[in-house]
C-alpha cells in the first residue's frame, strides 16, 4: 500500500527558505509519452530523456501500441540499441542512452501485457535478448558508476520482460563471478545481478526455460557454489543475492526434467542441513523448506520436518510479544513494548470509531462473518517481514503490508494483517497501520462474503482501496490532489479500476472517487453499501456503472475545485509562488530555520555564508527503488541527512562530507529492493562561504514492471482426491495430484463460480507442467466448466495448468480416482 505523510505548507517558508537562498528549477527534456508522439526521430528523443519521464512511458495509453509501441517501432529501436551497445565505452552519457532505451522497451512490453494484447513476436523478443546478451558480454557492461549501473540494471531486467532467459542465462551466470566484497558495497549494482533471479522466477512454467536447464544442469552446481563461496555476504546489505540464488534453485523443483529436479532436491537438502532453524542464517532453511513444501513435499516427509511445529517455534521466537486491545485487535509483535502496543490500540480504537461514523454501520457486522478478532502482526523491520512473514502466514512480501481475511464464514478462521515498522524508535512507525485496519473493518461491516466474492463482478476496487486511503488521510491526501494536474480520469474510468491498473489509479484516484461520493452523494454510498452488505455484488457493479455516467461531469468540475484549492496550485492566492500572495514578493524577514519540502527529482541553487544552514525534507513513498541527494558547486558546503528527524550539522545520522561542495548521499534499498519509506531530512551547511551550489534529489519510485498488486500465486496447489479446492485464476495457476498405485483413471471437474464471468481452460500432463502450447490432455470449452478423463498406468503426480487468456474466474476443482 502506498505511504505518504501529510504535508503542511507555510506561506512564508515557501516564499523564501532562508536569507541568501536563490532558487532555480531546471526544465526537463520533452520526453513524456505525449511529447514523443510527434517526434520525427523517436530514438533520438528517447536518448536524451530524463528518468522523470519513465513513469509516463509505463503508464502510456493503450493507443500507443499502434504507434510508439508498435512492433515496427520497437524493431527499429532494437537496431538502434544494437548500434549503441557496439560503440559503448563505459562513458556516463552513453550509459544514460542505454538505460533510456531499455526502460522504453520494457515499458512497451508492460503496456502491451496489461492491455491484454497478443505478445510481441518471438522473433522480436529473441532479437532483444541477443542484444542484451551482447551487452552483458561487453567489457564495460558491469562498470560501476550511477549511469553505468543504471544501464546494466535496465537491460538485464529486460530479460524478464521479453521472456528469453535461455538466450542470456550463460552470460548472467558468468556475471556472478564479479561479485566480491568490493562490488557488494554498491547495492544498486548488486541488484542488477539479482535480475537473473527475477528472471528465473518470472520463467516459472516456461517450457523453453526448462529445456534449456535440462541441457545445462551445471548452472545448478554453479548457483550452489556461488552461495557457499559468498556466505560472508549474509552479514551485509547484499545478502539478498545469496538468498535468492538458493531460493530460485529450489524453484527448479517444478521442472519436468528428472535430473534438474534431482539436483535441485540435493541442494535443498544441503541447505536444510547447513542452516538449521534457529541458527544465525535460518532464513535459508525457510527458503529451502518453502520450496520443498510447494514442489517436493515428499522430501520434507523423508527428512521428518513438521511444518506446523516449525511455524509455531519460529513464531514464538520472532513474535514473542502479545498484547490484547480492548477492541477486536490482538497485537503480536517482534519488538513493540507494552506501552507502544497500547498506543497502537488507541490508534486502532479511534480509527474504528471514525469508521463506524463515516460508514454508518450501526455497529452491525454483515451476516455470516465470524471475524470478531483480528491479529495485527508487526515485524520489527522490512527485512524480518520479508524473511519470515511468507513462511508463517503465506502472504506475499513485495508490498507494505497485507490484510489476510481468510474465510469469514468459518468460525475457526483467524483474520490478520501483517505489517512492519519503518523505524525502531519510540514512535510506532508501523507502515499502513490505519489503511490495513480499515480493510478489516470494511470487510467485516460492509462486505458480505470473502475477498473473491467482493471482486466477482468488478467495479469495486475503487472503493476497497480508495476507502482505506480516505480513512487514513481524509481531506489531507495532497499526493492524490496533485495527481489531477497530470490529467483527469472520468468517474466511470475510476469506477472500472481493477488490481491490474497502476498504483496511482488504484489508490489515489480511488481515494478521489470515494471522497467525491462521500462528500457530494452520501445517500448513493448508503445505497451501495446496502448492496455489498447483503452480497449483491452484481447489483453493486450495475449501480456503480450508472452512477459513473450520471456524475462524470460533476466529478470533473469537483476535481477542478480541488485543484484550485490545493496550496501547491500556482493560481491559488495562498501559494507563495503566486505574485498576488500578500506574503510574497519580497519577504524581508524570512523564517531563518524553516524546514521546507523539497520535491523529488528537483534542483535548487543555494548561496550561503559560513555556518549558515538550509533545512529541507523529502518524502520518500513506498516502492521507491533509488534515492540519493547530491550537492555540487563552489566554496565549501556540507550535506547532512537524517531519517524521520530534522537534520543539522551538529545532529545527523549520515553524511559524506569532504572539502569543497561536491558530496552525495545514497540510500541503499532494503532486502525487498525498495528504499525505506518515510520522511528524509537534510541540511546544507556552510563550512565556509559557498555559491552556486546545486542541490539535487534523485528518486525513482516503483517502476510498473513489477507484478500487479493482485496476481496469481504460481506455487502449485496440492489436490487430494474427493476434496474440492477453490481457486481464483487471473491468468495462470498450477495444481498437482498424487496418484497412488492401483488407480487406472483420474477424472477431473472444473466448475465455475455462480457468476461464470470468465473463461478458464484446463490442461494436464503426467511428466511435466503443461502449458497452453504443450500438454497431454486439454479441456477448453467456453466458460470455466471443464472436464478431463486421464488414464494412468503408474503411481506419481499428474500436473495441471489452469489458464485464462483474457478474463479469469473463481473455480472449484475436484478429482476422483477409478
Swiss-Prot record:
GO terms for molecular function: metalloendopeptidase activity; zinc ion binding. Keywords: Collagen degradation, Hydrolase, Metal-binding, Metalloprotease, Protease, Secreted, Signal, Zinc, Zymogen. It catalyses: Digestion of native collagen in the triple helical region at Xaa-|-Gly bonds. With synthetic peptides, a preference is shown for Gly at P3 and P1', Pro and Ala at P2 and P2', and hydroxyproline, Ala or Arg at P3'. Residues 1-29 form the signal peptide. It comes from Vibrio cholerae serotype O1 (strain ATCC 39315 / El Tor Inaba N16961). Belongs to the peptidase M9A family. This is Microbial collagenase. Zn(2+) binds at residues 435, 439. The keyword Secreted applies. Its cofactor is Zn(2+). Possesses gelatinolytic activity. Pfam families: Peptidase_M9, Peptidase_M9_N, PPC. Residues 562-594 are annotated as: Disordered. It is found in: Secreted. GO terms for cellular component: extracellular region. Its EC number is 3.4.24.3. GO terms for biological process: collagen catabolic process; proteolysis.
Amino acid at each position: 500500500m502506498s505511504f505518504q505523510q501529510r504535508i503542511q505548507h507555510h506561506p512564508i517558508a515557501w516564499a523564501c527558505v532562508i536569507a541568501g537562498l536563490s532558487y532555480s528549477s531546471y526544465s526537463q527534456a520533452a520526453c513524456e509519452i505525449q511529447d514523443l508522439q510527434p517526434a520525427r526521430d523517436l530514438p533520438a528523443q528517447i536518448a536524451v530523456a530524463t528518468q522523470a519521464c519513465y513513469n509516463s512511458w509505463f503508464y502510456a495509453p493503450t493507443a500507443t501500441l499502434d504507434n510508439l509501441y508498435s512492433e515496427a517501432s520497437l524493431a527499429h529501436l532494437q537496431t538502434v540499441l544494437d548500434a549503441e551497445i557496439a560503440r559503448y565505452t563505459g562513458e556516463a552519457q552513453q550509459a544514460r542512452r542505454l538505460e533510456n532505451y531499455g526502460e522504453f522497451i520494457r515499458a512497451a512490453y508492460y503496456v502491451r501485457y496489461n492491455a491484454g494484447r497478443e505478445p510481441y513476436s518471438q522473433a522480436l523478443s529473441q532479437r532483444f535478448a541477443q542484444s542484451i546478451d551482447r551487452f552483458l558480454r561487453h567489457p564495460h557492461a558491469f562498470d560501476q558508476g550511477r549511469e553505468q549501473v543504471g544501464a546494466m540494471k535496465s537491460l538485464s531486467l529486460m530479460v524478464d520482460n521479453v521472456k528469453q532467459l535461455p538466450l542470456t542465462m550463460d552470460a548472467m551466470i558468468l556475471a556472478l563471478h564479479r561479485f566480491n566484497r568490493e562490488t557488494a558495497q554498491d547495492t544498486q549494482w548488486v541488484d542488477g545481478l539479482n535480475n537473473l533471479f527475477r528472471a528465473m522466477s518470472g520463467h516459472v512454467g516456461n517450457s523453453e526455460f526448462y529445456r534449456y536447464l535440462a541441457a545445462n544442469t551445471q548452472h545448478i552446481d554453479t548457483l550452489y557454489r556461488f552461495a557457499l563461496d559468498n556466505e560472508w555476504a549474509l552479514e551485509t546489505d547484499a545478502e539478498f543475492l545469496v538468498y535468492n540464488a538458493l531460493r530460485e534453485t529450489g524453484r527448479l523443483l517444478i521442472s519436468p526434467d528428472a535430473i534438474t529436479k534431482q539436483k535441485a532436491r540435493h541442494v535443498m537438502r544441503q541447505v536444510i542441513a547447513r542452516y538449521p532453524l534457529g541458527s544465525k542464517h535460518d532464513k535459508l532453511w525457510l527458503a529451502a523448506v518453502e520450496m520443498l513444501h510447494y514442489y517436493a513435499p515428499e522430501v520434507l516427509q523423508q527428512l521428518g520436518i513438521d511444518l506446523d511445529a516449525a511455524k509455531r517455534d519460529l513464531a514464538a521466537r520472532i513474535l514473542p510479544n502479545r498484547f490484547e486491545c480492548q477492541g477486536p485487535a490482538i497485537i503480536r509483535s517482534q519488538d513493540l513494548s507494552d506501552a507502544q502496543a497500547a498506543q497502537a490500540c488507541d490508534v486502532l480504537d479511534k480509527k474504528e470509531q471514525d469508521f463506524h461514523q463515516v460508514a454508518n454501520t450501526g455497529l452491525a457486522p454483515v451476516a455470516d462473518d465470524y471475524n470478531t478478532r483480528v491479529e495485527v502482526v508487526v515485524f520489527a523491520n522490512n527485512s524480518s517481514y520479508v524473511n519470515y512473514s511468507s513462511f508463517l502466514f503465506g502472504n506475499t512480501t513485495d508490498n507494505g503490508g497485507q490484510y489476510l481475511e481468510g474465510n469469514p464464514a468459518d468460525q475457526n478462521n483467524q483474520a490478520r494483517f501483517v505489517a512492519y515498522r519503518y523505524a525502531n524508535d519510540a514512535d510506532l512507525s508501523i507502515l499502513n497501520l490505519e489503511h490495513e485496519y480499515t480493510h478489516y473493518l470494511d470487510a467485516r461491516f460492509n462486505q458480505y462474503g470473502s475477498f473473491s466474492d467482493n471482486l466477482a463482478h468488478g467495479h469495486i476496487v475503487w472503493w476497497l482501496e480508495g476507502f482505506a486511503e480516505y480513512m487514513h488521510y481524509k481531506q489531507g491526501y495532497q499526493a492524490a490532489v496533485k495527481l489531477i494536474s497530470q490529467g483527469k480520469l472520468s468517474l466511470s474510468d475510476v469506477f472500472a479500476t481493477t488490481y491490474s491498473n497502476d498504483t496511482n489509479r488504484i489508490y489515489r484516484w480511488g481515494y478521489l472517487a470515494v471522497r467525491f461520493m462521500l462528500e457530494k452523494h452520501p445517500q448513493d454510498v448508503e445505497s451501495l453499501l446496502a448492496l455489498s452488505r447483503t452480497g449483491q455484488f452484481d447489483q453493486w457493479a450495475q449501480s456503480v456503472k450508472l452512477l459513473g455516467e450520471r456524475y462524470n461531469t460533476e466529478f470533473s468540475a469537483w476535481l477542478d475545485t480541488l485543484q484550485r484549492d490545493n496550496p501547491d496550485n500556482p493560481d491559488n492566492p495562498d501559494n507563495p509562488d503566486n505574485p498576488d500572495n500578500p506574503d510574497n514578493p519580497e519577504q524581508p524577514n524570512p523564517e531563518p530555520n524553516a524546514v521546507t519540502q523539497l520535491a523529488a527529482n528537483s534542483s535548487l541553487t543555494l548561496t550561503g555564508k559560513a555556518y549558515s544552514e538550509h533545512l529541507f525534507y523529502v518524502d520518500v513513498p513506498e516502492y521507491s527503488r533509488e534515492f540519493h541527494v547530491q550537492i555540487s558547486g563552489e566554496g565549501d558546503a556540507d550535506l547532512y541527512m537524517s531519517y524521520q528527524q530534522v537534520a543539522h550539522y551538529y545532529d545527523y545520522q549520515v553524511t559524506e562530507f569532504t572539502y569543497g561542495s561536491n558530496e552525495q548521499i545514497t540510500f541503499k534499498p532494503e532486502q525487498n529492493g525498495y528504499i525505506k519509506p518515510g520522511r528524509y531530512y537534510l541540511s546544507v551547511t556552510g563550512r565556509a562561504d559557498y555559491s552556486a551550489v546545486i542541490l539535487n534529489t534523485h528518486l525513482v519510485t516503483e517502476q510498473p514492471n513489477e507484478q500487479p498488486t493482485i496476481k496469481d500465486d504460481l506455487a502449485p496447489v496440492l489436490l487430494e482426491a474427493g476434496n474440492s479446492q477453490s481457486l481464483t485464476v487471473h491468468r495462470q495457476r498450477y495444481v498437482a495430484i498424487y496418484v497412488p498405485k492401483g488407480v487406472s483413471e483420474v477424472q477431473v471437474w472444473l466448475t465455475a463460480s455462480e457468476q461464470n464471468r470468465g473463461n478458464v481452460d484446463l490442461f494436464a500432463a503426467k511428466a511435466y507442467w503443461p502449458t497452453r502450447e504443450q500438454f497431454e490432455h486439454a479441456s477448453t470449452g467456453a466458460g470455466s466448466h471443464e472436464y478431463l478423463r486421464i488414464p494412468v498406468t503408474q503411481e506419481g503426480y499428474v500436473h495441471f495448468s489452469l489458464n485464462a487468456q483474457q478474463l479469469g474466474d473463481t473455480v472449484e476443482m475436484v478429482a476422483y480416482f477409478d
